[in-house]
Curated annotation (Swiss-Prot):
Highest rank taxon of the organism: Bacteria
Protein name: NADH-quinone oxidoreductase subunit I
Record gene name: nuoI
Localization, UniProt: Cell membrane
Region described as Disordered: spans on this chain: 164-199
Membrane topology field: Peripheral membrane protein
SUPFAM superfamilies, per database record: 4Fe-4S ferredoxins (SSF54862)
Residue sites binding [4Fe-4S] cluster 1 per the record: C55, C58, C61, C110
Biased composition (Basic and acidic residues): 182-199
Pfam families the UniProt entry points to: Fer4_7
Entry's Gene Ontology BP terms: aerobic respiration
Catalysed reaction, written as an equation: a quinone + NADH + 5 H(+)(in) = a quinol + NAD(+) + 4 H(+)(out)
Length: 199
C-alpha cells in the first residue's frame, strides 16, 4: 500500500510556515496602494488656461490606437462658436474602455498634449455601455479662472496657445519681450485631472 502521508504533511508544513510571515494581502478597497506617478490610468482631455480645449480634432490618437478604442469626430471652429484655438476642435470624442489596453500610444501621438493619462484605475462597471466614455466625461474640470467654451481666444493668437506663453503674462499685458518666454511641459498650467475631481 503506497504511503500517502508525506504529500499532505508537506502541504500542512507550507501552511504552518506561512502563518508566521508578514501578511502581504491588502485590504482593498479600504486600503488603496498609491500608484506610481507615470501610471497609465483613465484618460483626461486637457484645457488651456482660459478654458479652451486643447484637442484640435486631428484624430491622430485614434489612428495610433492599436485596439481601435478611440473615436474622434472633428468640426470647424467659428469666431461665434470657438471651442479650441486654431481651425478645428474635437466635436465628438469617445474612448471605449472595453477595448483600451492603456498602452499610451495615443498620448505620444497627440501634437498638442491634449490627451494625458491620470492615476485613476477604478473603471469597473456592470454595464458595458457605461464604459464608453464621452468627451464630457473625459474633459478636465474647469479650474478657477477658466471660462467654459465656446468663447473667443483670451490669451493671444493661435501661436501663443501652442507655444505655451504664460497665461499670467497674457492676461496682465506685460511687455512684449516677456511674451517670448515659453513653458516647459512640466510647468503646464492647464487644467488636469489632479486639479479637481471628476464630477
Amino acid at each position: 500500500m503506497p504511503n500517502i502521508l508525506p504529500g499532505p504533511l508537506r502541504g500542512f508544513g507550507v501552511t504552518f510556515g506561512t502563518m508566521f510571515r508578514r501578511v502581504t494581502t491588502e485590504q482593498y478597497p479600504d486600503e488603496k496602494k498609491p500608484t506610481m506617478p507615470r501610471y497609465h490610468g483613465r484618460h483626461v482631455l486637457n484645457r488651456h488656461p482660459d478654458g479652451l480645449e486643447k484637442c484640435i480634432g486631428c484624430e491622430l490618437c485614434a489612428w495610433a490606437c492599436p485596439a481601435d478604442a478611440i473615436y474622434v469626430e472633428g468640426a470647424d471652429n467659428t469666431e461665434e462658436e470657438r471651442y479650441s484655438p486654431g481651425e478645428r476642435y474635437g466635436r465628438v470624442y469617445q474612448i471605449n474602455y472595453l477595448r483600451c489596453i492603456f498602452c499610451g500610444y495615443c498620448i505620444e501621438a497627440c501634437p498638442t498634449r491634449a490627451l494625458t493619462m491620470s492615476n485613476e484605475y477604478e473603471l469597473a462597471d456592470d454595464n458595458r455601455a457605461d464604459l464608453i466614455y464621452t468627451k464630457e466625461q473625459l474633459l478636465a474640470p474647469l479650474a478657477p479662472g477658466m471660462e467654459p467654451p465656446p468663447h473667443p481666444m483670451r490669451l493671444g493668437d493661435t501661436k501663443d496657445y501652442y507655444r505655451g506663453t504664460p497665461a499670467a503674462h497674457m492676461l496682465s499685458g506685460e511687455d512684449d519681450a516677456a511674451s517670448e518666454t515659453t513653458l516647459d511641459r512640466s510647468d503646464d498650467h492647464s487644467a488636469t485631472y489632479e486639479e479637481a475631481e471628476r464630477p
